[in-house]
């Protein structure tokens, strides 16, 4: 029930944290050794800026006194953008069939008493890393397949009356860079997030190619017995321009934001190789915001690794005191 609002400093040393409790009272807590931020790529840079660490020019527009100028705070935001191809199928049952009325009740019974059936399925049944025609030696597109499908409309997702399967693809190494910045002194006001998706020619080209690769998979001989036509993008979407328009209207994030407090040794870097905030003592960051560039896959395991390394750094330094 606590909401961090500001890091407390003694000159260049982080010594505590100010937070708002569940009763909306402002409280403080002091630390004996150091503080580790693990707020993620959106809120770690926001808390730094609320505490006076960041681009001094931006902080002044918010009326926040600059404690330490770090130009890179909140910059370098990267994210995996995904696009779906939904295929109608026949002669097989999918989650679309098994999640309706009596079938859903049967599956609920199976799960409650036998831990079997529909409710034991993961979100995606199959995954693949593939090399596009633009790949430079290693896979550059990740694909997941789900035994269900729906049509995304302006009013949200619509569950069709017929069985479908879905392929979801993302370009693993996007070039586009965005930003995350505090937009108010109020710690409870969400930061301003600007992704700048599809901001480079290569990113545009790769997302169009991702749609084409997924379509080719569904047209493979192994799918011929169950293929019942494409739901999305649909037969009317054929040219690169039409595919790009479909991507711009339907692409989604995959919740892999990284890079907004990136590691490095240059003037734009926020943390050093030991995860310490540059120019500040007693403050580290251990989350996906420290990634210099997005990894070619899911970010979860890499985040766990960062947490483990942070623990090692703290333990090593503590034993040396």
Where are these regions (language model features)?
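N-terminal low-complexity, intrinsically disordered patches enriched in charged
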Residues: 81-83, 306, 316
